[in-house]
Amino acid sequence: MTRVSIDRNLLDRPYQTNLTYMVHHQSSQSPHSYRTLLEHSRLEIDSLYRRLEGTFSQQHHHRQQHTLAFAFCGRANTFISCFISFASLIRLLTYLLRKIE
């Protein structure tokens, strides 16, 4: 039978990044044990998701600020990339015109 266990102490610390996930393989593995494993895993993941969702909803204001900052940085990076591409295109055209003359 295959068993999955998640360290419950880690679930109590929402900022912990590492989740201890242990899978133990034993000699008898039947389809029934896989179904049990999948159901158990789904329940554990649902529980973890609900805890994380609660943590993120508490930090909603900070998340909005970060989203705006990332959107601004993304637009700035796009503008800079376009400007560099345009400058490179002008340099290439200048080079080709010199070659033609």
UniProtKB/Swiss-Prot annotation:
It is found in: Membrane. It comes from the Eukaryota. Keywords: Membrane, Transmembrane, Transmembrane helix. It is a single-pass membrane protein. This is Putative uncharacterized membrane protein YLR230W. GO terms for cellular component: membrane. Partially overlaps CDC42. The chain crosses the membrane at residues 68-90. It comes from Saccharomyces cerevisiae (strain ATCC 204508 / S288c). Its main location: membrane.
